[in-house]
């Protein structure tokens, strides 16, 4: 029997080793604070996440993820994002590999837009990062730092620093963040310019100096497609869009899809792109300043199949002055539903960029995102005061008042809380049962529900009675607020809103602007309840009322259940088999003879000592 126990122990260890090996080599780490991918596939991990591991997630990460989740039904051309122009990095670091570390950090901070300027070198016919050509009569090492001059401007450029380095850095970020919990949709915006010269007798010397040689292709690619090709597994291409538009015409549509089907240009929802098409990035030429000449770059069919241009995808890029005027129109209280519908249906991919003459401010950025614009930070430095930085950064370094932050990475981090169209800066509050840790023994208190305030969404006590927002089921910019009715979040049911409306929340910035407009027109009082809470799981904000389930809860599918019980089932079968073998081999001849012998001895003993009656 002792041997049987030892065998059972060894079999148990073996089963654990065999069946746990696969789970230990999972493609994705479910620790949401440091999730990385170990695969080169662009497929997003479909495994569910244990949300309890993210209880201490930074406020910013929760806000980013929540804004993404509520925007899932929205077409990608309407989803608000924020990002940086690499010019702001190169202005400080030079066109060198040193800028890659800063790009990596900016991506990890949540940059969802990267604006990249590419230069078509008419001397060598390649796309390059450096705004000036390299003289070919000088021998360079790949890591040579060279001061090159063109059009009376001098630039610090590293000879071997190419577009491939930028694409590889973005690819590594996309790969490492390719999980259900951390996946976001990015925009790679291209600004095309020429290194141009007018061919004449006077430029013969220039042609000799900058003529291509055997190392020309080291510093760039000959086509736009080749330039972005390292990102191809993740790119949402014009071909993918065309396929979607063809299939959408014959599919059953949700209320949101029916509304946006009225648009002059239909795009798939964020949810479809990320989780059905499994794409992470679109590449869009937002500005084409190529000089028309005999040596100008000719866009190829392969370029058009993988990259969007203005004639294949409409977009708008405004400067700060134009953006201010745009926001004045959008946030005008005289607007009606039709105004907001036109913005949602007939304007697409709305960006605003700044420059060193007029930089973004926190207040300005906040206004831009509220009126439906996506800010792209393009200046080389920003003014950030000590107070505002201290409220938004975990770093030990604080700038003095009005100090210029030459490190754009630090400035962007300080601006992050102002980049959300949804949550107010510093929201959502987490790990609090009550505000100020005040708990009354005779009253229910639960800061788990979200309400609208003048500066965005805030977490409020679910038991407090506020006015609440009702949205038209078929028209997402049509809102109703009853100024005579106040309810706690828990008491807002299906009968709380008029027919054709339900208790809901804004899912993009234009809907939010329309709701602000109604609140002002109806003289409603803030806060106003919207349908969003983290009642079920802390930091997992969901819509659908107080009983809505977090999509990231750890669930057990049939397949997973079989995998879970398989080891114990096999161990049980092995044990039964061993018991059967033991019983089988116990019946040997020696044991049989022994039994017969003792049976005979006992029979003879009873025969000799047979007694009558009951012994006294």
Curated annotation (Swiss-Prot):
Gene assigned in the entry: MTC6
Keyword terms, alphabetized: Glycoprotein, Membrane, Signal, Transmembrane, Transmembrane helix
Pfam families according to UniProt: TIM-barrel_MTC6
Leader sequence segment: 1-20
Membrane spanning stretches: 565-585
Lipid bilayer topology: Single-pass type I membrane protein
Species of the source: Lodderomyces elongisporus (strain ATCC 11503 / CBS 2605 / JCM 1781 / NBRC 1676 / NRRL YB-4239)
UniProt-listed InterPro entries: Telomere_Capping_Maintenance (IPR051008)
Protein name: Maintenance of telomere capping protein 6
Family: Belongs to the MTC6 family.
Glycosylation site positions: 24, 31, 34, 38, 50, 137, 147, 152, 201, 221, 250, 264, 310, 342, 378, 386, 394, 402, 431, 472, 502
